[in-house]
C-alpha cells in the first residue's frame, strides 16, 4: 500500500474549492486499493471535510493529533474515543515535530499510539531529527530513541502503524533534504524495526512538493509522503498524487 497524507495544520480552507481543484487536476491516479490519500484538516473542519468528500473516489479523512488521555477534565484536548465517533476517520498523525516542540515526549507519543489502536484508528507516527542533531552526527541515536518505545509493543505487528520520517530542519522551508540523506535515515529506521521483527510502511515528510516528490518516491523503502504546505493547494496536491 502507498500513502499520500496531507497535513493542513492550523489553516482553514474552502473545502469545496479545494476538492474541486484536486479532482479536476488529478487525472488518472491509483485507486484506494493501492493508494490511500488522506486529508487531515484542523479539528473544526473535519466534519465539513467528511461531508464534502463523501462522494470522492479518492479522498479519506484523518486527524492531525489526538490526546493521550481518556475523556475527562482535560481542557482543549480531543480523545481517541471522540475521533472514533467519526467512522470516516481511519488515520491520525502523532508525534509531529510541532507537537513534540510543544511538549510531546516519546512516552506521550507512544501513549497516543496505543489509544488510537484501541479505537482501530491507524497512527501515523512521526520521527525525525533537528538540524542541530543532524550536524552533531547523533542522528541515528536520536532516531533510535524515538523508535525504542515501540520495540516491545505487541500490537505493532498486527495493526497498521505507519512511520513518517520528517527532516525537521526542512519543514516549511521549501527546501527538501538531499536524497542521499533521506535514504540513509529511512534505511536506518527500516533496519532498526527489522531487528524487532517489525514491518511498517515508512513515509517521508519535509518540504515535499510536486517537483521533488517523484524523485523521493523512487526510493525503494519509501511508501509514501506526508505533505504540509504543498497540500494546501488542491492543484499542487493533485500533481503530487500523479507521481505515485
Region roles according to the model:
Residues 1-244:
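Active-site loop-to-helix "anion-binding N-cap" substructures in soluble metabolic enzymes
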